[in-house]
């Protein structure tokens, strides 16, 4: 942003043209560009929201795993399911998968951070462009964004760009409701990008003004922003490659569709035909696709594992709330561990008959005064940790 303020300062007294045939950017195109900028900022909210859904699915998997273990301890695994015959192997696989899924979840979060960062950078480039053009306005014949009249566009003509009087403080921020709402739209990235293409906008919505608008920011001739223009060095681009100018463009802005590399002729003006080829959008497309791929992969794996678990869970265990499940599981585990200890001690004295009886125990355990509903946050956290430790112990030989 500092660069553009310096540019404006340097061009301040000569930023407007002194000859005719100087057109401005149409406010319609400016608003479309700002709409894209808002959508790109919203990608941060979008990836955070989608990541939270995956985290919730992983938590659900852990609960299904506990339900299954409780069903096993109470001999309530559906006997008719062929896939439930080798429960021990299934549980080990689930625990191993949980660890793998947690790693994949972290990789997905890293991908989401990169996608959000790339989108934020692209959004910044776009809004800096429109901000500079909106600020470059003086008398009725000197402005760089036009609304089809003899005067510059005001903030009410650029409501997709500014939330009030034109200025850096009124650009939409990432925490604004407008940006958050954009994250909820069903529009996909490629659809929003295509909305600013030359084919979507057309010349009439890009080239504004009446030919006497005096905008020097669309000139690359010797009197424009690139003084002493050279046909090999002094091409100009705005928006990171959205609007491109060849050397010696006098401001007439006879725009055609094309990319930065196509603006090679004298006086050429090319507005992107394919935004996916614009450099600032390439990283957004690539990194957002990587995030989506990582998200979809881990969601699919979690769903497959949950489906395998669900068909082996007893009906009563499936009906428990999460709080009830933790309480039941903890007390059942404590009871089983105590029982295993007693059996081990008795076995040392040859009490084989009692050992058999104990190992076939299926009664509900006697519970103490503990209830999750009445516990404080620290106790709940401790119970979750205890449950995780007990699950490992069960798989090591208690079951």
From Swiss-Prot:
It comes from Trypanosoma brucei brucei. Gene3D superfamilies: Variant Surface Glycoprotein, subunit A domain 1. This is Transferrin receptor subunit ESAG6. Residues 1-17 form the signal peptide. Heterodimer composed of ESAG6 and ESAG7. N-glycosylated. Glycosylation is dispensable for heterodimer formation and host transferrin binding. Its main location: membrane. One of its GO terms (biological process) is symbiont-mediated evasion of host immune response. Residues 377-399 form a propeptide.
